Every structure is written in structure tokens, then in C-alpha cells.
């Protein structure tokens, strides 16, 4: 998925940036990607495939969010989470509350804020792959 995507609504915190390229990270397969603005190359994010870290992650994507990227069903989109990776990568977290949807057919993307409070904005990537974040007292 090394392509340019149009984000008509921008990303949260960056509403004016509309075009981003998804860049492969060598050796990371589909688990880790980089999302870089084509309009401001100083703006970039680390993306993680959340299901690799949280196999029980099961976000309910509202139909209107799917329609916004030109998808008829959740099966037509790729879903990633924006990660924060500090110097000590073992403390990396993912924003499971606001995943990023990509429709590889329309080349449209959208960040979605879920109404599901089981998922937090700073979920540790390396603390228990079998858990749903809510099981940890959220």
C-alpha cells in the first residue's frame, strides 16, 4: 500500500492537509507504515495494523464513515491506528479510539473517532495481545 490518499477532511489536528502518502517501512510488512503529508513533508505519522497487537480489537465503523471513503462495507477498507513511538519503543502506544480508514480502490482516507469507550487514545502496544483495552479497567 505505497500510494497517495486523499483525506477530504484532513486528519485531526491537521485539517488543511489533504494528501498523504503511505510508505512501507523496510522489514515491517503490513504491520507498520508511515503516513506522510505530500503538502508538508514535515508532517508524518507512524501507523500500526492494530489487529497485530490487539487481535480482539473489533471497532464498529459507522456506515457514514465508510460512505465517506467510498466503501460499501468494512471489508473494502484497510484500518490502521496512529502510533506514538518514543525513544524507548517498548513504551509505544496506539490510538485505538481514532483509527484511520483507507479505501485502496478510491484512494480516499479518513480518520474516524469511535464512540466506543473500550478503546483509548494511548493503548500500550506491548502489554498483552489477548486483551481488549476495556479489560484493563477502562
Curated annotation (Swiss-Prot):
One of its GO terms (cellular component) is cytoplasm. GO terms for biological process: bacterial-type flagellum assembly; regulation of translation. The keyword Metal-binding does not apply. This is Flagellar assembly factor FliW. Gene3D superfamilies: BH3618-like (2.30.290.10). It is found in: Cytoplasm. Belongs to the FliW family. PANTHER family: FLAGELLAR ASSEMBLY FACTOR FLIW. Keywords: Bacterial flagellum biogenesis, Chaperone, Cytoplasm, Translation regulation. Interacts with translational regulator CsrA and flagellin(s). It comes from Symbiobacterium thermophilum (strain DSM 24528 / JCM 14929 / IAM 14863 / T). Pfam families: FliW. NCBIfam families: PRK13285.2-2 (NF009799). Acts as an anti-CsrA protein, binds CsrA and prevents it from repressing translation of its target genes, one of which is flagellin. Binds to flagellin and participates in the assembly of the flagellum.
Amino acid at each position: 500500500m505505497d500510494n497517495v490518499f486523499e483525506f477530504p477532511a484532513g486528519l485531526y489536528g491537521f485539517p488543511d492537509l489533504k494528501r498523504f502518502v503511505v510508505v512501507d517501512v523496510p522489514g515491517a510488512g503490513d504491520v507498520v507504515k508511515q503516513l506522510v503529508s505530500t503538502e508538508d513533508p514535515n508532517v508524518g505519522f507512524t501507523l500500526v495494523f492494530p489487529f497485530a497487537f490487539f487481535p480482539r480489537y473489533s471497532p464498529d465503523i459507522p456506515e457514514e464513515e465508510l460512505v465517506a471513503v467510498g466503501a460499501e462495507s468494512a471489508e473494502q477498507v484497510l484500518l490502521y491506528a496512529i502510533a506514538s513511538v518514543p525513544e524507548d519503543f517498548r513504551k509505544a502506544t496506539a490510538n485505538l479510539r481514532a483509527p484511520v480508514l483507507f479505501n485502496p480502490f478510491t484512494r480516499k482516507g479518513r480518520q474516524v473517532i469511535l464512540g466506543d469507550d473500550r478503546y483509548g487514545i494511548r493503548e500500550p502496544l506491548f502489554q498483552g495481545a489477548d486483551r481488549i483495552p476495556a479489560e484493563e479497567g477502562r
